[in-house]
Amino acid sequence: MPRIHVLPPGLVNQIAAGEVVERPASIVKELVENALDAGATSVGVDVEEGGLALVRVADDGSGMDRDDALLALERHATSKLRDAEGLAAIGTMGFRGEAVPAIASVSRFRLDTSAGEDGAGTRVEIEGGVLGEVAPVARPRGTTVEVRDLFFNTPARRKFMRAASTEAGHVSEAVIRLALARPDVGFTLRSGGRLVLGARAGGGLADRAGQALGREAHRHLLPVDARRGEVRVHGLICSPDHSEATGRALYLFVNGRYVRDRAAAHAVLRAFAGTLPPGRHPAGVLFVELPLHRVDVNVHPQKLEVRFAEGREVFDALFHTVAGALRTAPWLRARPQPGDGVPVGDGGGPAPVPVAGEEAAEVLAWARAARPPEGSGATLVQPAPGAWATGRLAFPVVPAPGAGPEAGPRPEGYFAGLRYVGQHARTYLLCEAPGGTLVVIDQHASHERMLFHRLREAFRARRIPVQPFLLPQVVTLPPAAARALEAGLAELGRLGFDAEPFGGEAFAVKGAPAALAGVDLTALLTDLGSQLAEVERGSAVDDAFHDLLATMACHAAVRANQDVSPEEARALLDGLDAIDFKARCPHGRPVVFELSLADLERRVGRR
């Protein structure tokens, strides 16, 4: 039986390097973080062959004297941590004291550093973990680290490296993350002598975000800043007009440290629910700040993951901050302002909470409903004869007593300020905005968004008005949808349906949400049955009900190639101003398109 023995220090460092030094980008991250912890105001990074031949990081930080320079190359030697209490509240980027010796053990390593203003410094050279020359060197205050021939003494690790261009891309991404975290610090990155990134100190987060996300994304950035309890979320997020195919363009930082956290990213994605097309992801740069003792950063070899004491609190803060920004953003809505009947949060925008049951019932009175909840104060709107069969619009004009359809004040919002011109192709509403801008509104997408909003608010308040049928309507569904619907009758009831099995694949529907007057119940319940199969317990339930409500709104909304009267168009425009989000339908398609008078005149040669 083999005897247990203690590994030699060089091998220990190489094993540690396997965790800390995954690729050249890992070296860049560790060395730049050390520079930032040293108070650097300027950091320069140079790489050759993607960092495999050379990584050089130079900074103007505090530097080190000779003794500290040598001690920094010992394992678990650090200036950033002294006791267990400090480990529970880490505020620096590094703290373990293992990265530098691990890097030096798998490369030809040189450290030049100076802590004084007299130009006297120290040079330390190490090859494969073996200490070489230690000599004085003339240099200004700060530190320069050169790492050459990475993994020269561990060929098994070297062969797993990607092409130089791929590794250079990872280095660039690492520097971008660090530059986003510290807009107050200047950064340069050169690869093969070519300047890849130049970010001046103090340029602001918007400039850094533009460099990271691209010029097109920069045009769509919205500021976010809110606090919930002890958690503050701030930064920049792209409006739904710009999205990405993957989630890589969403940069999340916790107490200044870039992290990968699926729950946090999902919170942001949830905030965008119903605003992005399927398969698209939001982009932005978000910072989460909370007390140091409430987050554990010592859970990942490269400190890319963290553990929160109260993860739900962070999730809620991210969700409500981003969702609130989308509701209050200027591009999204000009009104209503505080006092217009919309719940107002601390920041002056709509509060990110469900509306009360009375308010939900009141807005749902737009639908051709028969019975709003008692005490709601909602206007009773009886369904027109044959409404369930004709499929007419579910937003009838309800004028004040004795007034015509144009009487009475309208919401003082963007859509209320439009002059309705007419309908194009029986699908688009054409309007004129002040200043001559042509506004084209997709009648189905806009009506779908309005119905979805009202269904969602009523669902949150558990007050969806139900239209009971005089006689049950029997619908027959495909076998798979019928099985899912029968298993999900409880969820169906929460959505406002009163249905029960009627033998085989048939169901007797005794009532349905009043907002869905005129829909094809068979088609709707078939779609809902398919989606109900995806409803699970836990966090997935809210996502699933979002999709169910979106399907209900889609079926109830006016269709393309359907006539809309001027009164109905006006009612739709006024209704859009009363909801918190109207730029996209629940499935992420745009609702509105604008063409300025200047653009129009350029297109016809008048300018």
Swiss-Prot record:
GN (gene name): mutL
Keyword check for Manganese: no
CDD domains in UniProt: HATPase_MutL-MLH-PMS-like, MutL_Trans
SMART domains (alphabetical): DNA_mis_repair, MutL_C
Protein name per UniProt: DNA mismatch repair protein MutL
Described function: This protein is involved in the repair of mismatches in DNA. It is required for dam-dependent methyl-directed DNA mismatch repair. May act as a 'molecular matchmaker', a protein that promotes the formation of a stable complex between two or more DNA-binding proteins in an ATP-dependent manner without itself being part of a final effector complex.
Transmembrane segments: none
Lineage start: Bacteria, Pseudomonadati, Myxococcota, Myxococcia, Myxococcales
Gene Ontology cellular component terms for the protein in this record: mismatch repair complex
UniProt xrefs under Pfam families: DNA_mis_repair (PF01119), HATPase_c_3 (PF13589), MutL_C (PF08676)
UniProt keyword list: DNA damage, DNA repair
UniProt family annotation: Belongs to the DNA mismatch repair MutL/HexB family.
Domain of life: Bacteria
InterPro entries (alphabetical): DNA_mismatch_repair_MutL, DNA_mismatch_S5_2-like, HATPase_C_sf, MutL/Mlh/PMS, MutL/Mlh/Pms-like, MutL_C, MutL_C_dimsub, MutL_C_regsub
Organism, as annotated: Anaeromyxobacter sp. (strain K)
SUPFAM superfamilies in UniProt: ATPase domain of HSP90 chaperone/DNA topoisomerase II/histidine kinase, DNA mismatch repair protein MutL, Ribosomal protein S5 domain 2-like
GO MF assignments: ATP binding; ATP hydrolysis activity; ATP-dependent DNA damage sensor activity; mismatched DNA binding
GO-annotated biological processes: mismatch repair
